[in-house]
């Protein structure tokens, strides 16, 4: 079997994780931590790409990695327009949307840009895989009770899809032939209904929908939320932080450290026990809803993400949902591996690369 050497890049706000893979085998994995003073020199996140590129190349050189031997470069997908899942070739339309922050400005936008900048000099392809904007929801799932306010698909697409493929292989099937419910449980929690390789419904784990998590509020009573918004006591940014960043366990018990909360539970703390069980309860409830989406025809329920290491949480969820289908636990997440595997499927011609296409923009005549 021929060896494809792939460089993968996963940019974060103050670090860049890189990996070099020979097919599925990791040759190098490293987290580059950037000096905050250096980061602050740049007004826009997107302006950091040259600095990060040079740092990546220096690290590769220091480890004796000959970049001329690379077959492809794959970056984490950023905040693009809604697209279906898969591996995409980085093209000009994608670069423009990443640089302009079409759906928002985030460090992940640098992934495709860095991949392209390094790959173009080597005349090899640059890819992204399953960004958070993956949207395969069915029309019926988009409807909310307010006209003009559609439900959005924003979830842990990269890890959910990667784990779904692993589980499919473990049980001897193709991902595209299965119905799965995948619950990714980390700083945010998303539960996706996977039908024949498409995530046809999923909670928006970023903007206040679904189970609460270590630092996100999830679904909350809307009437009370509106009253709080217009109480005159909070600015908009403060309210957004209550939803994302300072919600969930942070709001309820004062920490986003699930290990700390679990230790409190083991010591018999009644408040911590109730709150931790409530988080498991809400995850189980979301899984139950996803089972209805799939008409009760589910091949497996999969629990993944960092919180899947918690035996207390897993057992609480299992007790409530194991009547629906077998529960498989895949703790943690490996985004570098998932990116490498996405690129590898294309290099091996197991699937075709997808093209990022922007529909022609409407023009407005001005007198």
From Swiss-Prot:
Reaction equation(s) it catalyzes? butanoate + ATP = butanoyl phosphate + ADP
Q: Which GO terms describe its cellular component?
A: cytoplasm
| GO process terms (BP) | acetate metabolic process
User: Per its UniProt entry, which superkingdom is the organism in?
Assistant: Bacteria
Family named by the database record: Belongs to the acetokinase family.
PANTHER family linked:
ACETATE KINASE, BUTYRATE KINASE 2-RELATED
Q: What is this protein called?
A: Probable butyrate kinase
Lineage in the entry?
Bacteria, Bacillati, Bacillota, Bacilli, Bacillales
